[in-house]
């Protein structure tokens, strides 16, 4: 059917964005402006509308101050067909619709979008929870079943923790049976997917000019073979702590650069390169799985990057069917350029671009 294209994005009461609709062409759309002008919020809204996912700790953070609801809508074209994806946001809730019908995240186009941003360095230097979230987000898009089983697993862990806090040791065998089934499936899926993700990230890291080999491995708190024994063996500890201490929710995605963990030994520049390699691997894995390119969302293409890596990102944006690139500078080669000011985005004429470029 061809690649999915974002033809228009509409927002209402979303962070600092002015209400309205922006139309996007194929190719690169460049958005430039000062920090705080709304560029990142626009990409966040696009990513939410395209994938149904957000990493905001609370939904309320996405809603403008003084408002109780927010709304984003993506008009998508694929081949000759048009589809509309909507996300309604309220206090503690998120509602998805596809062509007016309520939907789940798994019902959205699986490729969707890949969002590259300066904060991705936290994938390298931040806590294990961020790396798990990266992996789970990607795998949920590769497999709707993975996302469903992960949600069931997380609910089960929460319910089991409540039973542990209540001292309900008698109920553990019931929860353990459910955990074993769900957790084992999650671990096995992660292992299979990581084989290819590791290969792609290694290639991307080399293309970015790193002379150190990147490797991705799972640091697991248990294994499918020992899971049942580990749950039984740590029962007393879990009752004392009131929480489930073993399972895939405690795993880490270990990033090794050369012979050492990147989180401990990589420089800031090396960490940024590793993060870019992860996002490039994400894009390639989605492309391989679904046979189409995600929309590339590239936030602040000049941030913390040397000229080689900056050009790498610009070349990547030019190589995909559609990309939205933001920065404090003009993005070269854009089919459309928008200026961001106080949450509003206005087209920039060729004459203005030439003046900006020589200023």
Curated annotation (Swiss-Prot):
The keyword DNA-binding applies. The keyword Nucleotide-binding applies. Signal peptide: none annotated. One of its GO terms (biological process) is DNA replication. Gene3D superfamilies: P-loop containing nucleotide triphosphate hydrolases (3.40.50.300), RecF/RecN/SMC, N-terminal domain (1.20.1050.90). ATP binds at residues 33-40. It comes from the Bacteria. GO terms for cellular component: cytoplasm. SUPFAM superfamilies: P-loop containing nucleoside triphosphate hydrolases. Its main location: cytoplasm. CDD domains: ABC_RecF (cd03242). It is found in: Cytoplasm. Pfam families: SMC_N. Keywords: ATP-binding, Cytoplasm, DNA damage, DNA repair, DNA replication, DNA-binding, Nucleotide-binding, SOS response. One of its GO terms (molecular function) is ATP binding. Coiled coil: none annotated. InterPro entries: DNA-binding_RecF (IPR001238), DNA-binding_RecF_CS (IPR018078), P-loop_NTPase (IPR027417), RecF/RecN/SMC_N (IPR003395), RecF_2 (IPR042174). Belongs to the RecF family. NCBIfam families: PRK14079.1 (NF010680), recf (TIGR00611). The RecF protein is involved in DNA metabolism; it is required for DNA replication and normal SOS inducibility. RecF binds preferentially to single-stranded, linear DNA. It also seems to bind ATP. This is DNA replication and repair protein RecF. It comes from Deinococcus radiodurans (strain ATCC 13939 / DSM 20539 / JCM 16871 / CCUG 27074 / LMG 4051 / NBRC 15346 / NCIMB 9279 / VKM B-1422 / R1).
